[in-house]
Amino acid sequence: MLQDSVGEVTTKYHALSVPLSLECGVSLSGVRIAYERYGRADGKNVILVCHPLTGDAHAAGFHKGDTKPGWWDGIIGPGKALDTNRYCVIAANVLGGCKGSTGPSSEDPATGKPYGTTFPVITIRDMVHAEHQLLEDLGISELYAVIGGSMGGMQAMQWSVEFPSFVRRIICIASAGYTTPMHIAFGAVGRAAIMSDPEWNGGNYPAEKKPNHGLSLARMMAHITYLSDESMRTKFGRRLQKQDAFGYGFDTEFSVESYLQHQGETFVERFDPNSYLYITRAVDYYDLTKNGSLTEGLAATQAKFLIISVSSDWLYPPYLSQEIMLALTTNNREARYAEIVSPHGHDGFLLENAQLNYIVGQFLTPMTVEDLMTNNPPSIQETSSIREAAELMIGHEINHLPVVSGNGTLSGIVTSWDIAKSVAGDFQDLAEIMTKDVITIQRSDSLRLAASLMEKHAISALPVVDDSNHVLGMLTSETLSLSEVLQ
């Protein structure tokens, strides 16, 4: 049940305690990482949220005076998938970003001026190492999970390779195990738009005179890839914007043109052009394959995985997520796959909160037997007659009846089929027909375990017992969809 937001939050800034050794060979000192924290840490409950390409550390809650919550507020907070009553959630702005973490717009301590293009080229691996150092500095020695969508999913997968024993669960959404030629092509066009703007000036521009035109064009082009044909048909169609007929010129006329223009204009107010260059190049370099094999590249991973795709995503189509799944299962890793059904394209991972809350919530905090069992079910003493058992089952409209001993512990189970067979066998005593070697389960056990026990033993009910073998409840196949749980 979804509840409230995490409320008012503030972004914190941390200077890493050691220099970062980057993949390009540079050692970067004085790195600062912006982050937000929601919920209390207990040493084993920390979840790291990795943001997409142009995201930031403000993933949930509200900054003072704001009316718009963080970018993933729909799944972070009390009662949501990333339940802040249960987990401590940390979101950090990536290395190379422009929302508080060290990047090309930060001051170079050697010159007192912004780095610009003298900032070293970074990779997804470098981002993950910066996040790892942040967590170590904060006294966090392990992660319950890392979750991210798009470029955030790349970081999550990189975490599983770089620090396999540090993280227990990986949730990769609408992403891939490597960057495809199409992704590289889109990044190249975006960078060309920025670098061809005269105001870019080789990356040396004042804050008040950025290459906004080029950045706006880059955003417009990229935003097309976040949508889908269906979503654009539904949202815009061929509608004109504020006019009834064609103007026969080159001004903005169609609604979709106006929308993209708005996306570009608002984006330049919150993002740095050089950061866009650096981060898209980091995405270009992302490749978890080893010797051309994703299976080999993921061989050292240890975490449990949840891989999620979006049905209408053509930027990161489902087949890219399925490639990750194939590599993981080939390596005998515990992995689940889910597909969000959405018309929204790549943006579906930011919009389909109901599906995400269910899918992610079940992976992080699976339902247990206690959630579905019938509490305090009827039971019968083992000294009772078959007739008494039959009357009790008919009266309560049940097909499974626990049989208990004098001290209340479980000694057997009788079914409606046992009752029917007793007539043909002319049995009188319950002990003659009941099953004595009963397969049981405990209330804290997972539904997946319950389903597998039912399937393995070809049974349709499980008595739920405590440590003393007293019956607490019953779980039946009528309340547990075997096929859904196993899937």
UniProtKB/Swiss-Prot annotation:
Subcellular location field: Cytoplasm
Pathway the protein contributes to: Amino-acid biosynthesis; L-methionine biosynthesis via de novo pathway; O-acetyl-L-homoserine from L-homoserine: step 1/1
Assembly notes: Homodimer.
PROSITE patterns documented for this protein: CBS
Name of the protein this chain belongs to: Homoserine O-acetyltransferase
GO cellular component terms, semicolon-separated: cytoplasm
TM region positions: none
EC number(s) on file: 2.3.1.31
Assigned protein family: Belongs to the AB hydrolase superfamily. MetX family.
Pfam families: Abhydrolase_1 (PF00561), CBS (PF00571)
Catalytic activity: L-homoserine + acetyl-CoA = O-acetyl-L-homoserine + CoA
EC class: transferase
Primary gene name: metXA
Function (record text): Transfers an acetyl group from acetyl-CoA to L-homoserine, forming acetyl-L-homoserine.
Residues given in the record as substrate binding sites: R219, D347
InterPro entries noted in UniProt: AB_hydrolase_1, AB_hydrolase_fold, CBS_dom, CBS_dom_sf, HAT_MetX-like
GO BP field: homoserine metabolic process; methionine biosynthetic process
